[in-house]
């Protein structure tokens, strides 16, 4: 015997009744078309709507290119954006996390694709997110050539969404980083970060929530900016400054993107065995937002250093006699540069990355 259907069951079902609004999706595509078009660069037409995005590598002038690919997300920084109801910066973060991973291998970002998933599509929110993605692409010089918007009823809490990004770049085969001549005595240059970037936000949120602090509250000494605004400062995109410096000086040996794991986990990724790292913690000043969180949560120096960038978002390895030239080139390109340490020969039993003094303790 067949079960008796509920009295409120519709006679005919539609996708919209199941929670998927195709019309809203089409409206979003219409709204973001001009945003994608604003990222056009040689090799792309930056037009959306096809089954796949096209890119003409031959138009970029490479002679013997190697393709480099990266993908990443924004993590739980998205929860801060949702709580603060500000969605126009996390798209920049999304692009930054992938393109910064490309440039550390010497690669020029060429194109980007995004994935936006939510339980219910709110077109205005999604449009703000994509506006940030387009801004990030413009900062990095890459084209937004496609993406996916997934409306999945029942998969996410009300108002939540998730992001993933995918970037592809290219570098001449003989220009791939790190180079093979990284050696003890080389100098480490640190490029200032814009804040937490997109790492460690599960700890940030836990501390803020346990202290019952509103994201709309003013940040102490923040000139009127709210805590949410300070925390949502977008990840700095180092691509154009790094590419210019790499090409003009030919002096960059290796580059590390300082993300989750901090100096301890990220710098060794670009070094050969037999080389250790010595960091002078007093060579730069940790930005106020890090000090604020450190004091609010009682976080010790070790935990700060293995969770956050502590004010340095990228580390560049150069020969000592070329450090000033590279530092000046990066500064001229708009970066704030610190000489933060050096490479030394491995000492048995010593930590791979040793920090003298507290990170960012300079005055």
Curated annotation (Swiss-Prot):
Where in the cell does this protein reside?
Cytoplasm
What catalytic reaction does the record list? 2-formamido-N(1)-(5-O-phospho-beta-D-ribosyl)acetamidine + ATP = 5-amino-1-(5-phospho-beta-D-ribosyl)imidazole + ADP + phosphate + H(+)
Q: Which GO terms describe its biological process?
A: 'de novo' IMP biosynthetic process; adenine biosynthetic process
List the GO cellular component terms: cytosol
Q: What is its EC number?
A: 6.3.3.1
Entry similarity comment = Belongs to the AIR synthase family.
This chain's protein is named Phosphoribosylformylglycinamidine cyclo-ligase
- Which species is this record about? Parvibaculum lavamentivorans (strain DS-1 / DSM 13023 / NCIMB 13966)
Name the encoding gene, please.
purM
């Amino acid at each position: 015997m067949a079960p008796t259907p509920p009295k409120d069951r519709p006679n005919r079902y539609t996708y919209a009744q199941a929670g998927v609004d195709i019309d809203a999706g089409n409206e979003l595509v219409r709204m973001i078309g001009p945003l994608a078009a604003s990222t056009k660069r040689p090799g792309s037409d930056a037009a959306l709507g096809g089954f796949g995005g096209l890119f003409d590598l031959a138009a970029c002038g490479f002679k013997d290119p190697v393709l480099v690919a990266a993908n990443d997300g924004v993590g739980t920084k998205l929860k801060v954006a949702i709580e603060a109801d500000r969605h126009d910066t996390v798209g920049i973060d999304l692009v930054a996390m992938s393109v910064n991973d490309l440039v550390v291998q010497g690669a020029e970002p060429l194109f980007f694709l995004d994935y936006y998933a939510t339980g219910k599509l709110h077109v205005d929110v999604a449009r703000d997110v994509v506006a940030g993605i387009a801004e990030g692409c413009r900062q990095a010089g890459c084209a937004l050539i496609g993406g996916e918007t997934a409306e999945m009823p029942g998969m996410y809490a009300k108002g939540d969404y998730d992001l993933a990004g995918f970037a592809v770049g290219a570098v001449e085969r003989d220009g791939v980083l790190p180079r093979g001549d990284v050696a003890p005595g080389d100098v480490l240059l640190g490029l200032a970060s814009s804040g937490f970037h997109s790492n460690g936000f599960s700890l940030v949120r836990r501390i803020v929530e346990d202290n019952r602090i509103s994201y709309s509250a003013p940040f102490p000494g923040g000139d009127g900016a709210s805590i949410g605004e300070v925390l949502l400062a977008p990840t700095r995109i180092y691509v154009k400054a790094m590419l210019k410096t790499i090409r003009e000086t030919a002096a960059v040996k290796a580059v590390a993107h300082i993300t989750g794991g901090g100096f301890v986990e990220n710098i060794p990724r670009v070094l050969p065995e037999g080389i250790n790292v010595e960091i002078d913690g007093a060579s730069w000043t940790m930005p106020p937002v890090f000090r604020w969180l450190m004091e609010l949560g009682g976080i010790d120096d070790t935990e700060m250093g293995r969770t956050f960038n502590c004010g340095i978002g990228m580390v560049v390895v150069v020969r000592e006699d070329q450090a000033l030239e590279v530092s000046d080139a990066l500064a001229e390109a708009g970066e704030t540069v610190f000489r933060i340490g050096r490479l030394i020969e491995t000492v048995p039993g010593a930590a791979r990355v040793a920090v003298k003094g507290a990170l960012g303790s300079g005055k």
